[in-house]
């Protein structure tokens, strides 16, 4: 996937002939979709043109099917923004856990663009596309979100020159994190310094119950120029190489 144009193997396995055929097939499928975890993520957002919500979702689902048929090995997540003052019902699509090399080598770019022009572009406005770096020293998790049905999504824009102090302050609080909490720093694609925090959770109740405990430390308040907190709904029918967690 690309912005304005959605673009949305593992280790060798030696298998003895004594293994059942179905087991061999399972191993082969896992090897095809497994990726080494790197620090980079691509996060983008689009919204439906007025009156095109149904058409956009149908076209986007068709486009994701193109990725499957092309045997794309990227893991593609899709979320709908649920609680937001500005972006309700917008679609966030993202892929996580990449090395620089893997993110630079998407599947069949020309064919991807062609299918996107046919199925998605007539119904969508693209409103953001960035490459982010996962910050393990600020986080709890490995940078590839658990595909839970809900997530809290926080975007933070800082005053110029405040990035280092912000990261030092958050690193000092890392041990207090409750549950999966993933911080990413924007590398390219918008105003910097800016950050995204993603907190995957099974339910809205889990997000709300932890809200007070997950507030940013007071010492960073003067560093922030803008902060937005939204909640997302995972779209199980808009995933590639991602299996959503069962509802609880």
Please provide the spans of the model-predicted regions.
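Short S/T/G/P-rich N-terminal loop/turn motif that feeds into the first structured element of a domain
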Residues: 25-248
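N-terminal secretory signal peptides that target proteins for export/translocation
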Residues: 1-7
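Bacterial N-terminal signal peptides
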Residues: 11-25
């Amino acid at each position: 996937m690309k912005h304005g144009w959605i673009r949305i193997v593992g280790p060798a396995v030696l298998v003895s002939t004594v293994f059942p055929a179905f087991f061999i097939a399972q191993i082969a499928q896992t090897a095809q979709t497994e990726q080494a975890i790197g620090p980079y993520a691509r996060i983008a957002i689009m919204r439906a043109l007025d009156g095109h919500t149904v058409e956009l979702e149908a076209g986007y689902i068709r486009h994701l099917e193109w990725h499957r048929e092309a045997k794309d090995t990227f893991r593609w997540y899709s979320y709908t923004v649920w609680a937001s003052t500005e972006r309700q019902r917008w679609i966030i699509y993202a892929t996580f856990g990449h090395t620089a090399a893997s993110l630079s080598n998407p599947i069949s770019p020309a064919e991807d663009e062609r299918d996107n022009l046919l199925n998605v572009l007539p119904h969508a406005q693209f409103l953001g596309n960035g490459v982010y770096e996962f910050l393990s020293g600020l986080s709890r998790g490995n940078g590839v979100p658990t595909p839970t049905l809900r997530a809290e999504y926080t975007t933070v824009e800082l005053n110029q020159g405040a990035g280092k102090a912000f990261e030092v302050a958050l690193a000092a609080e890392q041990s207090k994190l409750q549950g999966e909490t993933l911080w990413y720093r924007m590398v390219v694609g918008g105003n910097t310094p800016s950050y995204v925090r993603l907190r995957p959770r099974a339910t809205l109740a889990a997000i709300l119950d932890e809200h007070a405990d997950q507030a940013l430390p007071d010492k960073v308040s003067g560093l922030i120029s803008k902060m937005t907190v939204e909640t997302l709904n995972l779209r199980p029918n808009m995933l590639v190489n991602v299996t959503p967690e069962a509802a609880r």
